[in-house]
Amino acid sequence: YLLHKKLELYPKQHAAIISMTKEEAERFNLQRGDTEGLVNEPLSIAGISCSVFISEDKEKVKLSWRSRGDFAVNEICSKYFNGGGHKNASGGEVFGGNINEILEQVRTILKNK
């Protein structure tokens, strides 16, 4: 479902976004760990060098970023999403955040990258 219906591709930015609301997680009875590794899937698409998985629970919006090459996702996570990590594998979270607002913010960041 998430790869089929929720995958957004941004070819000019060499990026992809997958998002999952808390309602979708409940609808499919997803448990912690069920989406592990999902953020890596778009990197197998030709021309995609950055992938973001955005998920929501009752308390926060969580972002997982993966990239290849010189696309430094740790800088984005530390600057915008209270996170950090490695150059090609980073994450962040926004407590009390709205997933739609965060999704729009990620789109804007990627379009300006």
Where are these regions (language model features)?
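Hydrophobic helix-and-loop "lid/oligomerization" segment in the mid-to-C-terminal part
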Residues: 1-80, 85-113
